[in-house]
Regions:
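Glycan-recognition and catalytic cores of secretory/periplasmic carbohydrate-active enzymes
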Residues: 1-172
């Protein structure tokens, strides 16, 4: 209707109908959480469009956009997925996006029963999510690049998504 917000394009996965999107795009946290919901709905409803979209997006993410640490979201601007095979050492790799990889992978394992999805869950958890929190549990990193010139952690952040996302995944 007239009160609807304008489309935000690939950033918000609303440039075209979700089921018509050939690849996972846009803001990495948004996209992985949306993909998690699609896979969970596919498990519940068995709808072929949901199943095909979840598999296509996961294959695209795991095959072309996933870092060795299980991180996603290479582009600093908009904290988003880059183009295929864009995997720079100074990539953004937001901690919450790795949590999204974990959730998406877990939902795909539930949907298909294939253990390969849990391999990626473990990769994201052990190499990115856990790296995003200090051993004390009191400090966090918002991003986890492969190569950095600093190792700062913060107790709070203006965008405080990491602490609750961390708690969500360790309780999964």
């Amino acid at each position: 209707g007239p009160e609807a917000r304008p489309a935000w394009g690939d950033y918000a996965q609303d440039s075209i109908r979700v089921f018509d999107q050939p690849a996972i795009v846009g803001h990495a946290v948004r996209a992985t959480l949306l993909a998690t919901g699609i896979a969970a709905a596919a498990y519940e409803n068995g709808n072929a469009d949901y199943i095909a979209t979840a598999k296509r997006w996961w294959d695209d993410m795991a095959g072309k956009k996933l870092f060795v640490t299980g991180g996603v979201g290479a582009v600093h601007f908009d904290e988003k997925f880059g183009h295929d095979y864009y995997l720079p050492t100074d990539a953004y790799l937001e901690t919450c996006a790795a949590v999204g990889v974990g959730f998406f992978s877990q939902a795909m394992n539930q949907l298909t029963g294939d253990a390969k999805y849990m391999d990626e869950f473990e990769r994201a958890l052990y190499n990115n999510v856990l790296a995003g929190v200090a051993a004390s549990g009191r400090q966090y990193t918002y991003q986890n690049p492969l190569n950095t010139d600093r190792s700062e952690r913060w107790e709070w952040h203006p965008c405080p998504c990491c602490p609750p996302m961390f708690l969500k995944i360790v309780s999964a």
